[in-house]
Amino acid sequence: MDLIAPIDAVFLLAESREHPMHVGSLQLFEAPEDAGPDFARQTYEKLLSCKDIDATFRKRPATLFGAPRMAWTTEDDVELEYHVRRQAVPRPGGTDQLVELASSLHSALLDRHRPLWEIHLIEGLADGRFAVYSKMHHALIDGVSAQRLIQRTLTSEPAGEARVPWNLPRTPRTPATDSSAGLLGAARNLLSAAASGPTLLRTARAVLLEQQLTMPFEAPRTMFNVPIGGARRTVVRSWPLERIKQVKKATGATVNDVVLTMSAGALRSYLAERDALPDKPLIAMVPMSLRSPDDVATDGVKVGAVLCNLGTDVADPLDRLQVVGESMRKSKDVYSSLSSIQTMALSALMVSPIALSLLPGLVPLTNPAFNIVISNVPGPREPMYWNGARLDATYPMSIPFDGQAVNITLTTNGDNLDFGVVGCRRSVPELPRLLDHLENALSELESAAV
């Protein structure tokens, strides 16, 4: 029986009906041209035939006399028929019905009496495609690592071997055990590091003040920064990467700058149509890789985060892009000039509000540390396949928190950027409007720049 790391345990202790603590992913697949009508069923049966289950997918929280213990126990007899399920979307079988089903699945808690993961193969789409919704508890694996794990089940060849996440060959850096890969994974490591020396946080504060960077808890309060309920709504859409690149080329910005500005314009319009746009600009928490290209296989804390001024108080889209770009460049320049101890301290200070937001009742008592998390997760740039089916889209589905009622996560998939926006149904009404505003924001940037 292995003890659960203290920071991982927070995700179990803080979980409630209102606060599910799992990450998800929705993938869309196009069946092979020669596939018969039973292709989805046959794929499901192939999944169930993979009985060799990795240790990570056998772990569940231990109990003592019915009470939870902060330790993992290993399930010897994993019932795959429970964890791997077959679903069908209701008529008329469109994308809206698929995403609504995924939203419902994403709202439901994982059963702690079993290993903390589920995979749902979803059929019944009117266009003949099928989907896979996966979810895994954040105490087990962080969001970026889960995304990478799912990507490893894919192949670049249509005839490639069909692989499943619970039975993958080990690599020198296995995503299932790489807890430093994502933003919340960074919270695990960075908060532990910060706890080892109070001088780290003093160092971080000194760096922020000296460089005049945005400090945590300086963001305005918005309708997103409130306590949330348990019901989730997810909306998804894909945009051609070439459209973003055209704006990048015309303005000298980065792809991430354009994506952040696109998101900023959408948030500005969404809040403005509800008379809820604050005078001060919204602040986004943006995960940032601190790993150089030549140390991919190195362990340790290599993910930080920056606070980005989204310029939502600026009406002109190009001026807003300049604000976002300057904010991101300044933060990156500061990180590049820091020592390792300063980098660790600054990252800990930036990420720590994520863990603090898990504490019940804290949100109404403090100003928001930031208004929203916007994550850009690298994905495959070439066409990918699973059991011969072509991957059409991958929509990340992250975790809203108290004080963070909406989350925007996107990933690269071939020539597209796939956006997954997850929000609290109660706190963020008419979430699909945010997709319309994202399109309008990109169109405004194109009109002004290209």
What is each model feature region?
Residues M1-H22:
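Generic start-of-chain signal for non-secretory N-termini
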Residues M1-I7, L26-F39, Y44-Q404, I408-V450:
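Soluble acyl-CoA-dependent acyltransferase catalytic core bearing the H(X)4D motif
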